[in-house]
Swiss-Prot record:
Xref: Pfam families: THAP4_heme-bd
Renumbered ranges of motif GXWXGXG: 85-91
Family: Belongs to the nitrobindin family.
Highest taxon in the source lineage: Bacteria
Region entry Disordered, spans: 1-59
UniProt protein name: Ferric nitrobindin-like protein
SUPFAM superfamilies in the record: Lipocalins
Amino acid sequence: MSDLASEGSDPAERASEHSNGNAPADRPARRSGDQAVADAAERAKATGSRNIPVLPDLPLPEDTANLRLGPDLSPAMLALLPMVGVWRGEGEGNDPARGDYRFGQQIIVSHDGGDYLSWESRSWFIEADGSYGGPDLRETGFWRVGVDGDDEVIELLLTHSSGIVELFYGTALTQSSWELATDVVIRSQSGVVVGGAKRLYGIVEGGDLAYVEERVVADGPLEPRLSARLQRYIG
């Protein structure tokens, strides 16, 4: 387990703290359950009627990023249900060549009723003045849920535009937080050289999706690489 998995008691809150720079001691008082439900209903007024575009005339079930629309979610994917949607926001990155930087990001998590979730993430650099600074990272893949004895195993298969293919395995730490680590990293002939990684995702205060990625750099220890807090745009 990474250090992220040993700090504090709530993995989702830890992901949020790493993504916005707040210390654990700065946490606000917890809201009541009724207030959380009311806030979620208010957010759904803006996001609940949206969905991703789908090209017509295919005999297949349509992809949907909105659990209110399209095919029912497969029971096999209930452990990942809170992730379904489109998420947009900003984060902070650290690259050995570039140093610290800000980025914008959109993540699309959709399904077609099958026993997997589709995943697409695109990010872009944000300049010091807040302007667009060019494309950054792009990845696409699938989430699956396997079984190891009596335990569920979260699987994440990713292909990166940088020429990397990764297989992550992990677990659901709570009903709304998940931790994964790479089991295999494959580089194409033209791909960049990277080490293994760990990721922690969580649904945090306000219904946002927060995450932290740590990655091995130059055969060294795990180091913070990416963190972001994204707001729901669809779903």
